[in-house]
């Protein structure tokens, strides 16, 4: 595994990690969750499992995330899609004969869903892990808490605030522009797996997820006829049991390989 930097058309950069095995059968673009980064534990599982199955991986840092070049770009949804597109262009240029797959966690799955539905792309299979299918609901609320009201006040005064999903993750700079992006990017309304090709999707979700309601995930899967694998005693991280992270990636490998 080594680190790589890919330049985008807008002049910004995508900081990545790359692992391509010999006799590679395809390359997975991995996209992390909100306030996570390419250093996340899920990427570590992918780096261990995918090459053993003959699959390569490029795991990216989304704009405004991580500690490297991607952090310098303000978080906006189009910028996130641009990052995926730039990595995909690199793969097609460097490995023109290999198929491309997508693996997204939480916010990353939300972004991949938007990408598949609004951009030309070459990949035809995507795996959604703990997908934030209702991502706008996490920020845009009718009755925000006192803490959320304080952050909204900061954004009104300064134009931004910092937010992280928990104390273990690096805070992300949230702007009014990102709020506007969320207002116009409802995945339940926008998602269309067939708009830019016959895309196939599978999902995995924890039944005890307190970040993204599993019933929302079920509703999304049923609406778009997507196979979904539920893990009975798992939360949003899908990492409560020692073997769950491997089991989730095994599902993705099987899906990509069939």
Language-model features and meaning:
Residues 25-33:
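Short beta-strand element of the alpha/beta-hydrolase
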Residues 43, 47-69:
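Conserved alpha/beta-hydrolase
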Residues 65-95:
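Catalytic nucleophile-loop/oxyanion-hole region of alpha/beta-hydrolase
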Residues 102-104, 129:
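Short beta-strand immediately N-terminal to the catalytic nucleophile in serine-hydrolase-like folds
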Residues 1-21:
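N-terminal cap/lid segment of alpha/beta-hydrolase-fold proteins
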Residues 104-112:
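Gly/Ala-rich beta-loop-alpha elbow adjacent to hydrolase catalytic centers
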Residues 35-47, 215:
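The serine-hydrolase catalytic nucleophile loop
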